[in-house]
Amino acid sequence: MLKYKFNVGDALDRVGFTSYKAKTSGILSQDTLKKIKKEDTNISLKAINSLCMILDMQPKDLLIYEETDTEKEQKEKL
């Protein structure tokens, strides 16, 4: 399961990327911004690209993969 390494919503707030900026710039949709603030990683690659641009980071700086029990079971069946 992919997880954020830190609170990305807070990081966006720190750099001044508000809901208003999301709406007016079109860089991130408001729905995507809501997902990010809820720590939902089910966002598009385009959104991850935008986060990297806004926060001046690489994807590996944003996300980490932690294997769940379900994923372990699925992997064993391969």
Enumerate the language-model features and the residues they cover.
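A short, Lys/Arg-rich alpha-helix, primarily the initiator
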Residues: 1-20
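Residues that mark the N-terminal boundary/hinge immediately upstream of a DNA-recognition element
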Residues: 7, 18, 44-47, 58
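The alpha-helix within a helix-turn-helix
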Residues: 12, 23, 52
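Short alpha-helical DNA-recognition segment
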Residues: 15-35
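Short, basic-rich loop-to-helix N-cap that marks the start of a DNA-contacting helix
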Residues: 40-53
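Intrinsically disordered, low-complexity basic tails/linkers immediately adjacent to helix-turn-helix/homeobox/MYB/SANT
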Residues: 55-61
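Short, charged recognition helix plus adjacent turn
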Residues: 63-78
